[in-house]
Swiss-Prot record:
Any GO BP annotation: negative regulation of signal transduction
The protein's name in its UniProt record: Regulator of G-protein signaling 11
Taxonomic lineage: Eukaryota, Metazoa, Chordata, Craniata, Vertebrata
RGS domain mapped to chain residues: 1-66
Pfam family, one: RGS
Gene: Rgs11
Species for this entry: Rattus norvegicus (Rat)
Length: 66
């Protein structure tokens, strides 16, 4: 749901939403931590440098494929 909100939300909200999703689900010690493989995490972390609405797509796909 968070990734869908990011994808279809306003462009001005993208950096805030990306950071929020990262902190909540992917950051070390996150409250609702989700384990993704190292390659997907690497791509995601690279994308966080210049966040865009599709930066979390690889992580979302990885989670769906589990």
């Amino acid at each position: 749901e968070a990734c869908e909100e990011l994808r279809f939300g306003g462009q001005a909200q993208v950096p805030t939403l990306v950071d929020s999703v990262y902190q909540q689900f992917l950051a070390p010690g996150a409250a609702r931590w989700i384990n993704i493989d190292s390659r997907t995490m690497e791509w995601t972390l690279e994308g966080l440098r210049q966040p865009h609405r599709y930066v979390l797509d690889a992580a979302q796909l990885h989670i769906y494929m589990l």
